[in-house]
Amino acid sequence: MEYYTSKEVAEWLKSIGLEKYIEQFSQNNIEGRHLNHLTLPLLKDLGIENTAKGKQFLKQRDYLREFPRPCILRFIACNGQTRAVQSRGDYQKTLAIALKKFSLEDASKFIVCVSQSSRIKLITEEEFKQICFNSSSPERDRLIIVPKEKPCPSFEDLRRSWEIELAQPAALSSQSSLSPKLSSVLPTSTQKRSVRSNNAKPFESYQRPPSELINSRISDFFPDHQPKLLEKTISNSLRRNLSIRTSQGHNLGNFGQEILPRSSRRARPSELVCPLSSLRISVAEDVNRLPRIDRGFDPPLTVSSTQRISRPPSLQKSITMVGVEPLYQSNGNEKSSKYNVFSESAHGNHQVLSFSPGSSPSFIEQPSPISPTSTTSEDTNTLEEDTDDQSIKWIRGALIGSGSFGQVYLGMNASSGELMAVKQVILDSVSESKDRHAKLLDALAGEIALLQELSHEHIVQYLGSNLNSDHLNIFLEYVPGGSVAGLLTMYGSFEETLVKNFIKQTLKGLEYLHSRGIVHRDIKGANILVDNKGKIKISDFGISKKLELNSTSTKTGGARPSFQGSSFWMAPEVVKQTMHTEKTDIWSLGCLVIEMLTSKHPYPNCDQMQAIFRIGENILPEFPSNISSSAIDFLEKTFAIDCNLRPTASELLSHPFVS
């Protein structure tokens, strides 16, 4: 009763023979939460002046409070199965009935939760009553049963909940406007109480929901922006998609302005607003902001890349759009450009970060004239003018992860509606250490240079980048789902069949990288993304390195390789700092297999220093005891102490474990 809407109150009045008072109750927006506070004097104000009718109302109300009408709830458990259960609001009794329908026992070992877009919310008994007796609550159809010891739904249960949520209309919060007289009498807590709870706890592992769910709940994922702006973006994306289908290609252009909430723009420090051609001068001369980099490159590291005009057909399906199909089509006429990561400055022999004119990333960012808080035609006009602007405006959404050097946010191209993962690195956070700052910029420049070259179905696609006075943004393909490490944390170890599938895809990505002379150097579960259809994407190239083909630097007498990577996944030659080759990734791949099979990193009983010592002493990680002979042979080959004896990624693709 307490959670009845005004419409349900009207239906109840009709059922007890008081339908003549429905209009007066509706005019005063009387809902279930108000019924307990109604007395005979207040009922007279609502038109029930007859004392006998008033007493009849109070008697029926008390009966309704003691014996509420049953509702139908749908529970999800056991790998996406659903069961309908009738409930009168008793949490424990309802849970016991639901568990019995799923052939589960001991209600004390289970609890109930719901998914709300990208979040999971555990349900208390009071919140359970709210859901039961609020007929407009969308959570009634997707209550998830989870173990109390590990209160996290399985992937199948979560997928089923998302499917149901996608089919539901967005829940509307009920806004009451009571008459002044009733407002002065009823308790404030009763007037303002909200039916839906907003205390949803985000996923600890930064879940990446599918684009369809983001589209249907877009305000949840871009909470700082006004819904009208987001709706306009989706509308524009549909219109632009229709026009682009008739053209031969689409120019991604330069990423520039971030559309900021009005409050953020007011407090925003001054930013670099300059054409790309002047950026070399601006950055090179500002030696106080960008410290010199001790490591030099002679000649400067130069990488061929292409303007982000088009994308290979094999990657068209990987682009995630909000409400539209992929925009990028190959026209076969890509123009090449040079991306100079380092150049000589006028300040001695030291190198500073700079970018040549015409390179694909545009390190420009400025506040947008669009006001997310405005409801005037300004919102409508500004987005339509984007076609004349060479830089692309984008909208920052929710936090979805962390990388080697910064946090990763959900982003959206304000013109096309394309979803992106935006790796954002705050430059000011390392200003206290010039040496660390220099290394950061060095690594980021290297990451961008590598990413520009890559185009493969199992590699996260680079889209662009920009720079302003306080942070660097790297725009990457949005991969719905999550990392292998996050899935292991939530669901436990993988079956060997699934491991084979994931490792085979990872090997294809490594084969592509190694064929281009690139060593990832940080293969681990946290850097392997899995989309919601099971496709693997290798990510986070923050410490990757491009090898010089036929170089002697990895042999005796060459430059000493750096100590880079995650300790538990390091190969012996990395720990000993003797060489870095593509075989380093093969050792880490073996560690990834163990991680997937056990849901723990290699050397689980060691801390980082102990693990490094054991690796340096050529002590192999312990193999899981219940794996197949082909898995054992695969691991033995990847863990060859002599890196020259380890097979290549191409050779491992023909191994029985994955073939």
Swiss-Prot record:
Keywords: ATP-binding, Cell membrane, Cytoplasm, Kinase, Membrane, Nucleotide-binding, Pheromone response, Serine/threonine-protein kinase, Transferase. It is found in: Cytoplasm; Cell membrane. It comes from the Eukaryota. It catalyses: L-seryl-[protein] + ATP = O-phospho-L-seryl-[protein] + ADP + H(+); L-threonyl-[protein] + ATP = O-phospho-L-threonyl-[protein] + ADP + H(+). Residues 394-658 form the Protein kinase domain. PROSITE patterns: PROTEIN_KINASE_ATP, PROTEIN_KINASE_DOM, PROTEIN_KINASE_ST, SAM_DOMAIN. ATP binds at residues 400-408, 423. Serine/threonine protein kinase involved in conjugation and sporulation. It is thought that it phosphorylates the byr1 protein kinase which itself phosphorylate the spk1 kinase. This is Protein kinase byr2.
